[in-house]
């Protein structure tokens, strides 16, 4: 049997600080992909390249609260 290495994935907490009203559709979809839809809501996500890319697209609408 092949044993999988247990990886401790990093966690990132993101808070929405801006409204997606009158923003391009790609930015609204990035917020939806992050699981954010209302102001001041927070999500705890895995720190992956995909998540980092979505945060980069909406960096003016979100705030990274903590990185562990």
UniProtKB/Swiss-Prot annotation:
GO CC annotations, alphabetized: large ribosomal subunit
PROSITE patterns tied to this protein: RIBOSOMAL_L30
GO molecular-function term, one example from the UniProt record: structural constituent of ribosome
Protein name: Large ribosomal subunit protein uL30
Self-association state and partner proteins as the record states: Part of the 50S ribosomal subunit.
Species in which this protein is naturally found: Bartonella bacilliformis (strain ATCC 35685 / KC583 / Herrer 020/F12,63)
Classification lineage: Bacteria, Pseudomonadati, Pseudomonadota, Alphaproteobacteria, Hyphomicrobiales
One GO process term, biological-process aspect: translation
Pfam families named in the record: Ribosomal_L30
Keywords: Ribonucleoprotein, Ribosomal protein
Keyword match Repeat: no
Amino-acid biosynthesis found in the keyword field: no
Top-rank taxon, per record: Bacteria
CDD domains: Ribosomal_L30 (cd01658)
Family recorded in the similarity comment: Belongs to the universal ribosomal protein uL30 family.
Gene name linked to the record: rpmD
């Amino acid at each position: 049997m092949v044993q999988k290495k247990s990886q401790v994935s990093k966690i990132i907490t993101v808070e929405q600080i801006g409204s997606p009203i009158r923003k391009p559709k790609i930015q609204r979809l990035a917020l939806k992909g992050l699981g954010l839809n209302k102001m001041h809501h927070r999500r705890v996500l895995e720190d992956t390249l995909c998540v980092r890319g979505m945060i980069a697209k909406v960096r003016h609408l979100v705030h990274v609260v903590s990185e562990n």
